[in-house]
Amino acid sequence: MEKQYKVGIVGATGMVGQRFVTLLENHPWFKLTVLAASGRSAGKSYEDAVGSRWAMTTPMPESVKKMTVLDASKVEEVASQVDFVFCAVNMPKDEIKALEEAYAKAECPVVSNNSAHRFTSDVPMVVPEINADHIEIIPAQRKRLGTKRGFIAVKSNCSLQSYVPALH
């Protein structure tokens, strides 16, 4: 793949966000360009924002240590710098739904690790080996949200994604 997609992590300082950081390091398809988190972390370097809470077994990648964390609630600022975001925020479900829809409405696709939209009828919950065709619902979601490019797709929970392929 020649093009690398510019991606952001919304909820970058939490444990799931940290995991996304490690997974995206040196990824051939994705270039991590934005780290976003709560207002408490905004304006700090990623290293300072996370501090001693780094929970991964590998050291924090050098490539992200000095990146400035953006405020995840400043949707337009984040969305303007990426092709899409991975969402790993830790907040009440109604707030997650509103935030993810705000990103989608800003024409920024959202790949969510959260459960907030898992039962939203026009949001695909994708296990690629099993139901990749479920992305066909995205045009209906875009119509509801009034978007051309923005949408939300969610992953299943970790237990489900591990045993569904074997059952299929």
Language-model-detected regions and their locations in the chain:
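N-terminal Rossmann-like NAD(P) cofactor-binding subdomain of oxidoreductases
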Residues: 1-168
